[in-house]
């Protein structure tokens, strides 16, 4: 079975969301791919195929028409310096917005994602090449993540499995 995971965070065993994914799927002999929407390098032993979209890519798309999204394969244990095409977190930039969780920032972010071309041929190629049997997408309290999940579900015609965690509907 091929499972396409759609999540906001990168799949790292050391983070809460990544640890949950690893614990859920560790003993399954399935093939996994992930679409994620934040900077960072994956680090897990389960998933090898990734498609990354970030706020920075969205901004570059709006101002310079560079495509949103990067497809890559990752083998656990690779050094971050070996993966230069992956967008890594800018702690100062993201730290500011994490510290100052104002509604205007969320509105601006969603506006930028809405006017960018994230539903592009690169994303469709990644989805087509992987050809998932099912889509697994945690249910976030985030308009864009819900829109992305809906798009992928409609594009593939595949069933979506989702769940709600206890901390996704608060700004704290």
Segments from the language model and where they lie:
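N-terminal subdomain of nucleotide-sugar transferases
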Residues: 1-80, 156
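Active-site proximal beta-strand in glycosyltransferases
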Residues: 3, 134, 138, 149-171
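Short, flexible loop segments at the rims of nucleotide/cofactor-binding pockets, characterized by
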Residues: 10-14, 110-115, 172
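Amphipathic coiled-coil/heptad-repeat helices and related helical stalk/stem segments
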Residues: 17, 21, 119-120, 145
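Conserved nucleotide-sugar donor-binding subdomain of glycosyltransferases
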Residues: 74-134
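Nucleotide-sugar donor phosphate/pyrophosphate-binding loop at the beta->alpha transition
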Residues: 116-119, 146, 169-172
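Short, solvent-exposed amphipathic helices
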Residues: 139-143
């Amino acid at each position: 079975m091929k499972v396409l995971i759609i999540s906001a965070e990168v799949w790292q065993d050391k983070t809460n969301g990544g640890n949950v994914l690893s614990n859920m799927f560790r003993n399954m002999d399935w093939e996994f791919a992930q679409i994620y929407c934040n900077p960072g390098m994956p680090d897990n032993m389960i998933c090898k195929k990734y498609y990354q979209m970030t706020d920075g890519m969205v901004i570059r798309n709006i101002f310079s028409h560079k495509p949103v999204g990067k497809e890559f394969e990752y083998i656990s244990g690779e050094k971050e310096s070996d993966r230069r095409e992956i967008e890594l977190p800018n702690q100062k930039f993201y730290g500011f917005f994490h510290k100052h969780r104002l509604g205007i920032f969320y509105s601006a972010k969603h506006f930028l994602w809405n006017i960018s071309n994230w539903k592009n041929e690169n994303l469709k190629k990644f989805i087509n090449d992987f050809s998932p049997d099912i889509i697994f997408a945690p249910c976030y309290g985030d308009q864009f993540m819900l829109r992305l999940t809906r798009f992928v579900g409609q594009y593939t015609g595949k069933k979506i499995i989702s769940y709600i965690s206890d901390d996704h509907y608060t700004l704290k």
